[in-house]
Structure formats: structure tokens, C-alpha cells
Amino acid sequence: MKKIVLLRHGESTWNKENRFTGWTDVDLTEKGVAEAAKAGEILKKEGFIFDKAYTSYLKRAVKTLNCVLDKMDLDWINVEKTWRLNEKHYGTLQGLNKAETAEKYGAEQVQLWRRSFDIAPDPIPEDDPRNPRKDIRYKNVTNADLPATESLKDTIARTMPYWTDVIMKQLKTSNQLIVVAHGNSLRGVIKHLKNISDEDIVNLNLPTAVPYVFEFDDNLNMTRDYFLGDPEEVKKLMEAVANQAKKK
């Protein structure tokens, strides 16, 4: 039996402030670091020993992975970083408060921007300092591939080739892998693995730093999936993510 653990990064500073983050490179909060450490401790207790790890170019995911591996005494394993696992690009919404944006545009519209399959926010202008074409970390990515905004459909289009050609290919010769990324890049992967419809994907909300295990047979057919943690606690965490656009 082969396993891949999907893990959304720990709480970031903009998660705490309830802002749209996207490709903005914000750090973890103290709570986020603690969440990552807890995830590592759980994975170690469950006996996981990863052969390789994957993460995005964004520090909230990179630092989460580093913390997890440190707690597991697996700092030495090979880690591969890729922009293709970055969060969905939220265009001009990046930096805005979700609840305040819902007050301005309506909760239904914000929910479509956050969770729908094929609706993207307005793109950031070419000369906007937030444009990834101005970021040195993407210097080896062609401008045509760098987004100014994305829907979940767009995010899947850049994530899935990497998932199929790199991660699943690696699983053929590995037993256990871990992928630490972001809510929407991981939602796209889960949509593929569980064959979730375009309509139903809107209802999937991933909590921060809760390990999500996928088991595969030797032919790489997915056989089982489950969160590590108390089911009621995981449910509450998922509901909290769903309610982020509501005024408190």
C-alpha cells in the first residue's frame, strides 16, 4: 500500500486577518507554527516515514513543511519546490478582507470568487507590484504561464500536470510522499482524486495543517482517504473555513 499525505499550510498572518492571500508571500503566525508542529507529531506517531516531499514557492507552505519534517526527524529527505503548487491567484482581491468584500459585493459573489469552479476575480494590472512577473522567484517561468488571476479551473490546469507527471510518477517507486500546499491547489488535486463534480467542489473546505491521507494500491488506484484527527474537530475546522466571508 502506498500513501500520499496532503497538508494545507498552518495559519498565516493573512488567514488570521481574514484576507485574500493568493500568491502574496505572507508568513505563518505563532498558531500556524504550532499547527504545523502538531501535524508533524501526529504523522510521526502514526508511523509515517516519507520518501520525498513537495511544496510550493510560498513561505507559509515551505515553513509548514520544514516544521513537519523537523518534528518527524526527517529534515534530511529530498524536498522539491514548485510554483505549480502555489495557491490560486486571487487577482485584485489579494490583500482585501473577505468579510468586508462580502459586504461590498455580496456574500454570494464572494463565495463564487472563493469556491466556484470557473469564475475568477478581476486580474491585477501588468504594472501592479503584486504581478508575479515582477517577482524574482518566477524568473524561470515564462510570462505566459504566470497568472494575473485564476479560477479553480485555472489552478487545476497548472497543478495537475505536475501532480500526474511528477508526484504520481514518483509514487511508482516510493511508499509515502507528503505534499504541503494551499487550500485551492489541494482542492484541485482532491477534486481529481475523488472525482468531485464542478458543482460540488464549492462545498469542499480544507482546514489548516490537518493531515489528509490518500491510500493507493500498487497500480496507483486510490483506495481510501481520511483525515488524521478527531472527526468532530475536523468538521468544526472545515466549517470555520467556510464561514470566513461572513461578518463577525
From Swiss-Prot:
Record keyword Isomerase present: yes
UniProt keyword annotations, A-Z: Gluconeogenesis, Glycolysis, Isomerase
SMART domains: PGAM
Site (Transition state stabilizer) location in chain: H182
A Pfam family this chain is assigned to: His_Phos_1
EC number: 5.4.2.11
Name of this chain's protein: 2,3-bisphosphoglycerate-dependent phosphoglycerate mutase
